[in-house]
Structures are given as structure tokens and as C-alpha cells.
Curated annotation (Swiss-Prot):
Residue ranges: DNA binding: 37-142
Keyword Transport included in the entry's annotation: no
Protein name: B3 domain-containing protein Os03g0120900
Location of the protein in the cell: Nucleus
Coiled-coil features, chain-numbered ranges: none
UniProt organism field: Oryza sativa subsp. japonica (Rice)
Sorted UniProt keywords: DNA-binding, Nucleus, Transcription, Transcription regulation
Gene Ontology molecular-function annotations: DNA binding; DNA-binding transcription factor activity
GO CC terms, sorted: nucleus
Pfam families (UniProt xref): B3 (PF02362)
Amino acid sequence: MEFITPIVRPASAAAGGGEVQESGGRSLAAVEKEHMFDKVVTPSDVGKLNRLVIPKQHAEKYFPLDAASNEKGLLLSFEDRTGKPWRFRYSYWNSSQSYVMTKGWSRFVKEKRLDAGDTVSFGRGVGEAARGRLFIDWRRRPDVVAALQPPTHRFAHHLPSSIPFAPWAHHHGHGAAAAAAAAAGARFLLPPSSTPIYDHHRRHAHAVGYDAYAAATSRQVLFYRPLPPQQQHHPAVVLESVPVRMTAGHAEPPSAPSKRVRLFGVNLDCANSEQDHAGVVGKTAPPPLPSPPSSSSSSSGKARCSLNLDL
């Protein structure tokens, strides 16, 4: 990890080098450093115990400590990225058999606002100029960094520009909403027309909801499943308790007037032969009465008569 640390130098010494810049009486210079290790802080590291546990392998490698000669521990001085010094007491706890940094650590946690999951990095200087100097840095955990990004970077979804506007948008009175969505770069699709009984309520809901939604979004597509085409319903006519679906071109032909003939003192109602073959469904004629043989032979092939005893 590369650290940039301000170094205090006299003004006369800083004036001779081009790599050193003065800023408010302090000169900034790049110091070569060696990264030692990282420690992801736990809830107990940033809790009320006010101590940071150093992993044993890193503690024995970089901060060797003789517990017999240093019962109270050592004071380690660090510099952060701004050059601010930090001093921690480093010691070994026999109860937990761990290496910890205690005094001064709680102040570092409060100032840097460390939370569980954040990472603390430790480094040391390299070369004659930075020999014996220790450095400390920190960074947020990845999920916090992602949460701080603007929502457009995390949830942006670019839709293809080939999706057209719905051709039925202007038929529902949403021309203004579609125009507003087009100006904002949104894809504004409206559902097809439904039954007339819900048309008034649907228009009112769409006029309120879609206009506000089109103004709030910059690029949005709304899809609706098309409704099946409406079927043509014909009124059903019931004749003699039999449902019949009436269609055009099948009207009942007008009935021709019947003929009445008086034969041998008996009145006969005679119907035309064409009317016998074009009877209407549902109408039944009374059963014919037997006629005398002489009358049936004389009227054969001309008309069928029924007796009407109207004496």
C-alpha cells in the first residue's frame, strides 16, 4: 500500500529540491513504505473493550515483544495518511494469550468512525530516511462502499431503443402523458381497450398514475397482455321452450291464407302445398282427420284438407 506522509523540514532545506512542496510551513514528500499486514476489525475490536487484537503470526513477526522484560508493554507510534501521529500501547495478555493494542485505540476508532468489517492496514518505512517509522491506514468494508454509490450506478437498466410506443396510446386520452414520457426518454406503453363498463374508471386511473409515473422515470417500459377479441353475441329467442339462435337471413316467411271448402255439408280448411314444406320450427298442426275416400281421390295432388265440423 502506498502512503503519502507529510514530513516537517526547514524551509531552507525544502527550497533546494524540486520533489518537495511546501504547504503552510509543512513540506510533503513521498516516503517509501512496506506494507506489513491488514486486520479486518471485529465487533469486539470496535466495542467497549477498547482494544485491537493483533494476529499472533503478524505480532511476532513485526512487533516482537519480550513479555518478561516488558510487563506493561510498549508504546508504538504510527502516522496516518494525513501525517497525524497516533500512539498505542502494545502488550501481551496472558488471560487470552493474545497481542493487543489498548491505550489510544478507542480514540482512533471514534475519529475514523470504524465499524465491524472495516480494514486497518499497517506499514513501515523503508530506507535510511524512513527507518523505524510506522504507518497506519484504514478503509471501509466493500458493502458500505457500494451502498454509498448513487442508485443509478447500481440499478440502472438500459432498455433497447427499438421498442416502439403503443399505437393505442392516443385512443385512451393519454397523448399528453405519452408526450411527456417521450420528452423524458421513457418508453410509454398503454394497455389495449377493455370492456366499456370499466372504461371510465380505467381512464381516470391511467390519467393520474401514468402521468406521474412518466414524469418520475427517465426510461421505463410498461407491458400489458392484450385482451382476447370480443365475441359477437346474438339474442336468443325461445319458442316452445326450445332455445333458438336467430341469425340474419332466416326470417319466418309470411303465411299464406288458407282456403275453406264446403263438401258434403262439411267445411274443409285447405293449405297450399308450398306451405307444407316450409313449416316453422316449434309450431305443430293438429292431426288431420280421416276424410271420405271419394273426397280424398278428387283432391289428390292439389291440397290436403282438414275437417272442420262447423255444422
